[in-house]
Amino acid sequence: MEISEKQIEKYLVKKIKAEKGLCLKFESPGYTGVPDRIIILKNKPVAFVELKRPVGGRYSARQKLVERDFNRLGQKVYKVKNKEEVDKLVEELI
C-alpha cells in the first residue's frame, strides 16, 4: 500500500520531536509555494522541508521558483518522499 504525503509528514514531525526539536507547519498567505515544514533544532541551522508522496508527487513551477529564491538567500530546501528519506534527513540535521 502506498504511503500518503500526510503519513510522511506525521513521521517527520514524530522524528523531530524525538530529537527535542520543532517541526512547524509553514504557511505563508500571499506567498505561495513555500516548503511544507520548518525544522528548528537546538544550535543547528533552520531547515525547510518539502514533502511529496512517493508516487506521482510533483513539484510545481512555483515551488521550484521559491526553492531557487531560498537557495539564493543561502537556505536549503530539503525534499523528502518516504520514511527512509526522512530518516536520512534527520541524521543529517542532528
Model regions: which residues?
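Catalytic phosphate/metal-binding cores of nucleic-acid and nucleotide-processing enzymes, i.e., regions
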Residues: 1-94
